[in-house]
Every structure is written in C-alpha cells, then in structure tokens.
Amino acid sequence: MGPKRQTVSLQEKKNRILNFFQETYTFYNIKELEKSIPKKCGISPMIVKDLVQQMIDEDGVISVEKCGNINIYWCFKNQTLQKLYDSSELIKKKIQEVKCDIATYKQELDKTLATGRRKKFTVGQKSYNREALLEKRKKIQDEIKKKSNSLQKIESIRWDAAKIQENKQQIRLKKVHLEKTTDNIEILIDYLYKKFFLKPEQIRKEFGIPEEFKEFTEV
C-alpha cells in the first residue's frame, strides 16, 4: 500500500498559482493556464479556471483584460505590493474614523461623569444608556487594536527604497565585522604557530576552523 497522498488546501493551491504568475512575469490566455499550471503547480486542470476566477473576483490578485475574442490574464509582483499599500491606507483611514468616534463618545461620557454616574442621561434632545456606551467604547477600542496590528503587519512586509537601503547598510556593517573577526583568527593562528610551534592544521582541526573562510559578495 502506497503512502497516503497529502491533501493540498485551497489557499495553498492559490498561493502556487500566484507564485507561478509572479515568477514567469508573462501574459496568458485560459488554455495556456490550463496547460501550464497543472505541470508547474501540481493542480488538476479541471479546477484551474475556477481557481483563477476566484483569485480575480474574490481575492483581486489576478488581472484580466479582454483582447479581441480572448481574455488575457496576468499578475506581477508590484501589483501585490500596491494592493498591500492600498489596504494599509484603507486601514489607516478606518482607524482615524474610529478615533473620531471615540472622541465623540468620550465627550459624552465625560459629561455623564460630571453629572453623576446615572445609568441613563440626556444630552441635547438625545437619550443615552451609560452601560451601552461603555460597551460600545470597549468594542471600538478592540477594533482599533485589531486594525493597528493588521497595519503593522502590512507595513512590516512592505519594502520601500529607504528600508532596502537601511538593510543594505546593516549587511555591509556585519560584513566588515566578520572580515575583521576572520583576520584576527588568522593572526592568532600565526601567533600560536610562531610562539608555541603549533601547526596551523592542528589548531584549525582542534577548534573547527576552516582552511579558508567564505567570501561574501558586495551588496
């Protein structure tokens, strides 16, 4: 009896299709997709069309345009990054709206506290329930926290020019530090050889030091 075949989730199938599009950087018609995706992604050709349509209608990660009498499909990496950026901007806007709501409810709550902790009170022509307002305030705060966490996740994976440059600089500093360390090791081996007549090969073997250190390319 052969090994049990592992089930691939719907999301994993979509991820494989997305990687296929972004790695090839090419435009396709549906017949080409139904031929290439099963080979590259291990997905049944019977469901390729439905999955691609879901990624257009529901996920919005694949683009489609009618060209003559056929549809052309594509998805480039910059489109995905732009979608993440748009999502972060939308979350920022919603957070700002919620903050405005909180400020309004806080003013109403402060008025309530100033006149005593009554369960029900009136501001202008409108009546309010203190417990209901406190519950709504808590829900809004929880929503802000949730959206803020989502925004932080999105911004943490979005690389702009400044972030790329910063990471390059950090890598350069680490490379310089590594080069100094390897130079010091070579100097120490030479010192032990001259001072105590210990063979370099013996020292390297004893401490697990390679004959040559790996060279790092410039970034």
UniProtKB/Swiss-Prot annotation:
Disulfide bonds: none annotated. Keywords: Coiled coil, DNA recombination, DNA-binding, Meiosis, Nucleus. One of its GO terms (cellular component) is nucleus. InterPro entries: LZ3wCH (IPR040661), Mnd1 (IPR005647), Mnd1_HTH (IPR040453). GO terms for biological process: homologous chromosome pairing at meiosis; meiotic joint molecule formation; meiotic strand invasion involved in reciprocal meiotic recombination; reciprocal meiotic recombination. Its main location: nucleus. It is found in: Nucleus. GO terms for molecular function: double-stranded DNA binding; recombinase activator activity. Residues 88-181 form a coiled coil. Required for proper homologous chromosome pairing and efficient cross-over and intragenic recombination during meiosis. Stimulates DMC1-dependent homologous strand assimilation, which is required for the resolution of meiotic double-strand breaks. Heterodimer with HOP2. MND1-HOP2 binds preferentially to dsDNA. Belongs to the MND1 family. This is Meiotic nuclear division protein 1. It comes from Saccharomyces cerevisiae (strain ATCC 204508 / S288c) (Baker's yeast).
